[in-house]
Amino acid sequence: MRSGEELDGFEGEASSTSMISGASSPYQPTTEPVSQRRGLAGLRCDPDYLRGALGRLKVAQVILALIAFICIETIMACSPCEGLYFFEFVSCSAFVVTGVLLIMFSLNLHMRIPQINWNLTDLVNTGLSAFLFFIASIVLAALNHRAGAEIAAVIFGFLATAAYAVNTFLAVQKWRVSVRQQSTNDYIRARTESRDVDSRPEIQRLDTFSYSTNVTVRKKSPTNLLSLNHWQLA
């Protein structure tokens, strides 16, 4: 009998020990959702955006900015060089920023960061790039030394200016539509909430009861304080 009891006790201790070690083991099955562990595995290209006007303009802007940057980089000698350096900075910056936005929009990465107003970001980028490309192209054309690379850079600079200007116009329209849609959604939400309150009189009665209770408590509190002070003086 004692050996049976000792065996049962040993099995109980072993099971409890295995439970404790299993609970403290770092190799526990995680409860993290599969969608979060996938990371960038769920990315997919959006062909509708690339086929649309904004997508095509983005692709054209990236290509034109890259060609303008390559043309300006082939110039070996310049005097003065300020206009060349400015055009080089504008073309490189426009290529990088527009390329990043193209990747964000074509892969729907902007949907994962809703805290940023992407329509406004695109509007600022296109407007600023159009203005800077226009100024840089004018300056480079004024300081042109009749070199083939400079002439090509000026031509592609003005083409990039036109592409960014058209995109700015479309981005302004899209931004206005998004602002109007947001205001309309807020108005509909407010109207729905007011109708819910009107259709449920118990909510109004509850609000009225809580308001009357607060008023009653406020009216009674000075009397209670006076009676308490009178009792303390007595």
Swiss-Prot record:
Residues 1-11 have a biased composition (Acidic residues). InterPro entries: Marvel (IPR008253), MARVEL-CKLF_proteins (IPR050578). The keyword Transmembrane helix applies. The modification Phosphoserine is found at residue 194. Highly expressed in testis and prostate. The chain crosses the membrane at residues 59-79, 85-105, 123-143, 151-171. Acts as a backup for CMTM6 to regulate plasma membrane expression of PD-L1/CD274, an immune inhibitory ligand critical for immune tolerance to self and antitumor immunity. May protect PD-L1/CD274 from being polyubiquitinated and targeted for degradation. PANTHER family: CKLF-LIKE MARVEL TRANSMEMBRANE DOMAIN-CONTAINING PROTEIN 4 (PTHR22776:SF29), MARVEL-CONTAINING POTENTIAL LIPID RAFT-ASSOCIATED PROTEIN (PTHR22776). This is CKLF-like MARVEL transmembrane domain-containing protein 4.
